[in-house]
């Protein structure tokens, strides 16, 4: 069963985490894209912004769920990674049409969209 919707940052790029000496937890800034959503979306967005490969993504999920996680959580995260990759790929293509280029970022986001769409579909079929 899905978790209740909650406030999500949705732009969990590493530049939006401010670490302050003497403070245990970082500050999270730039709430421009924030909204009420599935909390797992922030894990997915962090992974694609950090250009994590599969092993790193699995380590991130395991760190978020130290008590363990189920196949449904993984399928949801991978689905958000596919959709997020497509969103940011489309955004990059649009910005390129305006003369703003992002180099390998565009290709990286397309890769996330393709790879994680296949992965998520297989996971949903297994549920």
Task: Write out the residue ranges for each language-model feature.
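Active-site activation/catalytic loop segments of kinase-like enzymes and analogous catalytic loops
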Residues: 40-69, 82-100, 112
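Active-site acidic catalytic loop and adjacent metal/ATP-binding pocket
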Residues: 1-41
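Start-of-helix signal in alpha-solenoid helical-repeat scaffolds, especially tetratricopeptide repeats
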Residues: 75, 79-83
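Juxtamembrane loop-transmembrane helix junctions in multi-pass integral membrane proteins
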Residues: 69-75
């Amino acid at each position: 069963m899905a978790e209740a919707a909650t406030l999500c940052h949705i732009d969990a790029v590493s530049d939006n985490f401010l670490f302050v000496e003497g403070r245990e937890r970082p500050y999270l800034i730039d709430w421009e894209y924030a909204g009420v959503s599935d909390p797992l979306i922030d894990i997915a967005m962090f992974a694609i912004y950090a250009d994590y490969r599969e092993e790193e993504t699995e380590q991130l999920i395991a760190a978020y769920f130290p008590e363990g996680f189920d196949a449904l959580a993984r399928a949801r995260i991978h689905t958000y990674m596919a959709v997020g990759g497509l969103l940011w790929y489309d955004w990059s293509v649009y910005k390129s049409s305006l003369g703003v280029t992002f180099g390998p970022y565009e290709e990286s986001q397309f890769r996330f969209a393709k790879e994680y769409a296949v992965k998520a579909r297989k996971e949903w079929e297994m549920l």
